[in-house]
A protein has these predicted regions:
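Charged interaction segments
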Residues: 22, 30-142
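Short, extreme N-terminal segment that most often corresponds to the first beta-strand
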Residues: 1-27
Length: 142
């Protein structure tokens, strides 16, 4: 399941395609996807039978009302947005791992942390899945 709702203050066909590739579906009809300056991503409502992770176009004014402690405003930073939107608790695919200095994006269902510790010389500092706070800090100036 996706675990971090967030939004970005841009809405392009290329960005929507990247969201589809990581598992999100549009909440809007395809002819309405270009409407709105922001894209919001959320996990669907688990109480609904036909619920799914979705992205939805929004206007900037609407995005200003989200609770920043719950939904992260990525500004126009696409790398941060995609890193946060990819956070899941059921797979390591597209997840960022770090030891605080070295960063690696995982393309495997389950990260091989022992191998990464040896291969990248992470040494005594153990590599781990990056936290939301670490991702925000790492991608803030990208």
């Amino acid at each position: 399941m996706f675990i971090q709702p967030c939004f970005i203050r841009k809405n392009t066909p290329e960005l929507r395609e990247k969201l589809r590739k990581i598992g999100y579906r549009s909440m809007n009809r395809s002819d309405k996807e270009d409407e709105g300056e922001c894209l919001l991503v959320c996990e669907g409502d688990e109480d609904l039978i036909d619920s799914y992770p979705f992205y939805a176009p929004r206007d900037n004014k609407c995005c200003n009302y989200y609770d920043q402690s719950q939904v992260i405003d990525c500004g126009t930073n696409e790398e941060l947005f995609l890193a946060l939107a990819s956070l899941r608790d059921d797979t390591d695919v597209n997840q960022w791992f770090t030891n605080g200095n070295t960063w690696k994006n995982c393309m495997l269902h389950k990260a091989d942390l022992d191998s990464w510790n040896r291969e990248f010389g992470f040494g005594t500092t153990v590599v781990h899945k990056a936290t939301v706070k670490e991702l925000v800090e790492h991608f803030k100036d990208v």
